[in-house]
Regions:
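Active-site-proximal alpha-helical scaffolds that flank and shape metal-associated catalytic sites
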Residues: 1-85
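Long amphipathic all-alpha helical oligomerization modules
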Residues: 83, 87-115
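Acidic, carboxylate-rich catalytic segments that either coordinate divalent cations
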Residues: 105-133
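Charged/polar positions within long, soluble alpha-helices
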Residues: 2-6, 10-13, 56-63, 91-98, ...
Length: 133
């Protein structure tokens, strides 16, 4: 993200002095909580849906940075990377969920709750960025 920060005019000194926005920490904290506490098949289902939305956001951000701010490709590389679907992620996720279904290890209610909360925490992330003066 160094090239992106530089394109935004963020100096090394300013980056060191940055105080994280609490609302921007909720999503990664929740993903960590899921990794420690939730059943893998439930998390796979929730994250697969969330990553699809995230990839769309990244594609739109990269396009906007280039179109409206003339950011170079290097500055958009992070967003370009996540805008592209992982080559076999959906197939691997489907196989894992299918196996969990066959073994009655998928809690659909929990998976939906995790997905809903991931989306809510992601919205909190974006709203926190929007609120920065």
């Amino acid at each position: 993200l160094t090239a992106f920060a530089e394109a935004c005019g963020v100096t090394a000194e300013r980056a060191r002095a940055y105080d994280p926005q609490p609302g921007c920490q909720a999503y990664p904290a929740y993903v960590s909580w899921l990794a420690l506490n939730a059943s893998p098949p439930d998390v796979i289902l929730a994250l697969t849906a969330n990553f699809s939305a995230w990839g769309g956001y990244c594609a739109r951000i990269a396009e906007a940075l280039r179109t409206h701010y003339t950011f170079p490709d290097e500055a958009c590389a992070f967003f370009d990377f996540f805008a592209q679907p992982a080559p076999d992620l959906d197939a691997r996720a489907t196989a894992a969920v299918d196996e969990a279904l066959k073994e009655d290890r998928l809690d659909v209610v929990a998976a939906h709750r995790y997905g809903r909360l991931l989306q809510a925490y992601e919205a909190t992330f974006w709203n926190s960025l929007k609120a920065i003066p």
